[in-house]
Amino acid sequence: MAEAAALFSLSAAAVVEDVLRQHGCRLSDRDLASRRAEEAAARRNEAAGWLRRTVGAVAARDLPEEPSEEEFRLGLRNGQILCGALNRVHPGAVPKACAHVVFVNLIRSRCAVCHCSVMVVVNTAADSVLQPDGAALSAFQYFENVRNFLVAAQEIGLPCFEASDLEQGGKSARVVNCVLALKSYGDWKQCGGTGPWKYGGNLKPSASGKSFVRKNSEPFRRCQSMNEGEVPYEEAGFSGDYHLDSGDMSTSRPLKMLVSAVLSDKRPDEVPQVKAALKNGTDGTKSFSKSKMDTIEVYSKHRQTKKEAYGEVTLKQYSMLQLQSKHVEELKADIRATKAGMEFMQMKYSEDINILGRHLFSLAHAASGYHIVLEENRKLYNQVQDLKGSIRVYCRVRPFLPGQVSSCAVGSIDEGNITIITPSKSGKEGRKTFSFNKVFGPSATQDEVFLDTQPLIRSVLDGYNVCIFAYGQTGSGKTYTMSGPKNMTEQTQGVNYRALSDLFKLAEQRKGAFIYDIAVQMIEIYNEQVRDLLVNDGLNKRLEIRNNSQNGLNVPDASLVCVASTMDVMELMNVGQKNRAVGATALNDRSSRSHSCLTVHVQGRDLTSGTILRGCMHLVDLAGSERVDKSEVTGERLKEAQHINKSLSALGDVIASLAQKSAHVPYRNSKLTQLLQDSLGGQAKTLMFVHISPESDALGESISTLKFAERVSTVELGAARLNKESGEVKELKEQIARLKSSLAMKDSGSEQNINRDPEAFNMKMPSPGFSNRRQGSCELVSSQTNFRQPMEDVGNIEVRANPTLRQKKPSFDLQDLLASNDSPSWPDSISRANFQMGEERVTIGGEWIDKVVVNNNNSVGDWEGDSAALPDFFYQRYHSGTRDKQYLRNNSRKKDGNEFEQQRPRFYSTNTDDSDDIDIATSDSSESDALWQFNVQSINSSISENGSKIKKPQTKLRESSDTRTPLHSQIPSASRKTSNGNRSGRQPLSGSDSRRLSSNGRHAGTK
C-alpha cells in the first residue's frame, strides 16, 4: 500500500510539473490577452455557425450561433453535432450503433503537493443498454461519439483534440481548430477535391503530459475495453512481483489511471528505474522529488512576489478608481447644477424674449405709423411743391470709373443733403453742405432713381405737363441717367425708357376708363440749331420753336410718331441716339455735343364723360458744361463747346431772373431757354437732375453745379395747369364753330350784311383735319398739320372757335364796343389791368383772332358810311387758297428784341410785370397786329373829328405793292413790314406817324 502511495506521489509531482510548465509561459500583457480572446471568440463563432448550417438548426439546438466558451463546450460534449457534421462532409465516417455502455466518471480532486486541481478518470462497467430516441444520452454515449469522431478525424488527417477538452476546464481552442479544419475539408470536397488538401489554420501540436489519457496510448485503448476492476500491469511494464489485489485496487481506480498516465509517457528503459525508485525508495527518487519541490517552491515564491506586486498595483488602481469615482460624482453634481442653471436661464430668456417681442411689436407698430405719417408728409410736401410750383432738384453722384484712382471730394450723403470737402487756405479741411429734394449716392441704381420720379411722370396721364432735364458738367453721367449706357440692359435703362414703359403700363391698367394716344418727338439743339433726330435728313433741316402752341407742339415741324408699345419707343430712341451729335474729348469718350429733348405727347379721353386730357412730357438731356483747357477740344469741337456753354449760361440767366422774380426773363437769348420756356414759365411740373463727379480734380465744377442747383430749387413757378376739357364744352365749341363757319359762308358774298354784322369776319373755316381729329392711327399726328386753335383758361386743350365764351372776359374789340348802344365813351387812358386782359386775349385767341381784329379795324376805316363796300381783296384774303400759308409765314417771322423794347414805350404807360406774355404774344403774331389793337382804340375816341386820318393809310396801302397783307397796311400808325424770303424785319415808325400818335396823346408814354 505504501508503494502505491509513493507511485501516486510521484505521479502527482509529474502532473504538477506539467501544470507549472503549462502555466509558466503565460503572457502578462493584458491587451494581448484580450486581443487573443477576441480572436478566439471570432473563431468560435465561425465554427458554431458552420456547424449549425451543416447539421441544421434543429439538430444543433444546443449550440447557439455566438456561444461562449462554456456554451460551446456543452453543446459539443455529447458528440452528436460533431459526428453529424463529419458524416455530412464525409458520409459513413462515424457509425451510429454502440456495442456496450461504459460509464466514465471524471472526478476532480486536489493535489496533495501543490493543492492544484487535477482530473481523475474512473471507469465503471455496466450492462449494455440501448437508449430510446429522445432520451438523454449517458456518459458513455458521449464518450463513444467523441471517440468515434476523433478516430475518423485522425484518419482524414484533421487536427484533433482531447476528449477532456469538452469537459469543464478543457481547452476549447483545439476543438474550434478541429471544427474549422473540418469546414475547410468540406469546402475542398465541394470544389471537386482536386489536388492535395492541406489545412491552413493555426495548428498547435498538443504538448505531452498535459492530459491524463492520450488518444494514441495503449492504456487509453485498454481503458475502453475494461469491464472488470483488474488492470493488466504486465502490459504497462510492471513485473509480476508488483501485483495489487483486485480488492485493494477497486478502491483506488483513479490512482490506477493516474499511474498508467504517468508511465505512458516514459520510455521503456525508464520504466525499470521508475519501478525501482517506487519499490525501493532510492535516493535518486528523493533527489528528483526534492528538485521538483525546490522548483515548486521557487515558483511559488515568485508567484507570491508577483501576487504581492499585483496586489499593490491593484490597490493603487483601486484607489485611483475610487478617486475617479469621486470625481465622476462631483462632475455629475456639476452637471446637475449646470442643467438647473440652464433651465433657469432658458426660462429667463423666454421671458426676456417675450418682453422683447412685445417691445418689438410696439416699435413695429410705431414704425408703421411713422411710415404712414412720412408717406402722408411726402404727399403733402409734393402737393405744396405743386402749389408753389417749385422746381424739384435731385442730385446724383457718379461713381468712380473703372481703373480711376483719385481722392473723393464727397464727404457724406444724407437723405437730402450732400457735403463736399473743400481744401482751405490754412491747410485744414473745409466742408460745404448743399440741400436738395433728394440725393443719390454712387451706389444708387437706375431703378431707385426712377422710383422717386415715377409719381411726377404719371401725372402726364392726368393732364399735366412735365419737364425733366439733366444738368451737370461733361462726363458726370447725365446721358446715363436719362438714356442709359451704350450697352444697355433691362437693369441699366434710363429715365426715358422707364418713363414710357410706365406710361404704357398705366394706360393699359386704365383702358377700361380711358383711351390714351401717345406720340413722341425727339429733337436736338446743335450749335443753336434745332434738328429732328427721328428722320435721316433731319441734320440738314432747320426747325423753328413756337412757344405759344396750345397743343404742346413747340416744334410743330418736327416728326411726331405714334407709339403703341415699349418696343416702338426703344426703336425710335435708338434711331435718335444714332443721329445725335456725339464726340470724344479728353474728359469723356462719348461726350454729348448737343442738347437732346424727347417729347412725349399724351391725349386721353374719358369713356364715361368724354373729357379730354392732354399732357406733354419733355425729357431733356443737356450737354455738359466743360472747360476748354480740360477737354482739350479744337476746331469743330471747340465751336460746339462754345455754343454749349453759351446756352447753359443763358439757362443760368433765366434761372437767376426767375429766382429774383424779375419782370423780364430772357427766354429768347438761346434756343435752349426758348424750348424750356413753357416748362420754366409755370406751365409744367419741372424736375432737374443735377450730376456731379466725385473726383477732387472736378471740385470747382462740382461746387459751381451745386450752387446753380440750389438757385434752381428756390424758383417758384406757380401751380401747374390741368389740361382738361369736358365733353359738353367740346361739343358746344364745335357747334359754335360750325354755325359761325356756315354763317360766314352765307354772308361772305353780301356787302351789306358784312357791314351790319362785322362779327361774321370773326369766323374761320375749320380745317377738315381739325374737325375730325380721331381719324387716322394717332390723333396727335393729324393735329400736327392743322392750324393751332385758340386756347382758353383750361390750358393746353383742343378748343374750337367759341367767341361766346370769350365774351365772359372784358372785350376790347372795337365792333363789340360800338355794337352796344349804351356803352360808355372810350377812356383816354387804359389801365394796366385792362391792358393785360387785352393782351391775354390776343395771346389766347390764337392766330385767327389776330386776323379778326385786323378785319374789324378795316370796318372802322369805313365807319362814316355804314353801307360802304369793302374792297375785293379783303374777301380774297379770307377765301384764297394761300390764306393759311401767308399766316404761317407771318407767324414764323423773327422779331428783334431791341426793336420791341424801343417801340413798347410808345404804347405802354407803365411797365408790365409779366414780360413772358409779351414774348409769347409776339412769337406768333406780327407786331403790327398788336399795335393795331391800341391804335383802333385811339381812332375810336376821335373818329368823328379825325376821319381823314383813317383814310390816309388806305391810300398808302393802294400805293404799296410789297406788303405782306393789305389789311395791315390800313393800320393808322403801324410799322411797315417788308418781305425778305422766309424772314421779315420790322421798320421803325416814321417821324410823321410818331408825331401823329403823340399829338393824339392817348397811348404815348415812357418806359
From Swiss-Prot:
UniProt biased composition (Basic and acidic residues): 885-904
Q: Where is the Calponin-homology (CH) domain?
A: 41-187
Residues in coiled coil? 718-748
| InterPro entries assigned to the protein according to its UniProt record, in alphabetical order | CH_dom, CH_dom_sf, Kinesin-like_fam, Kinesin_motor_dom, Kinesin_motor_dom_sf, P-loop_NTPase
Q: Where does ATP bind?
A: 472-479
- What PROSITE patterns does the entry give? CH, KINESIN_MOTOR_2
- GO cellular component, as recorded: microtubule; microtubule cytoskeleton
Q: Which family does it belong to?
A: Belongs to the TRAFAC class myosin-kinesin ATPase superfamily. Kinesin family. KIN-14 subfamily.
Q: What is this protein called?
A: Kinesin-like protein KIN-14F
| Source organism | Oryza sativa subsp. japonica
What gene name is listed for this protein?
KIN14F
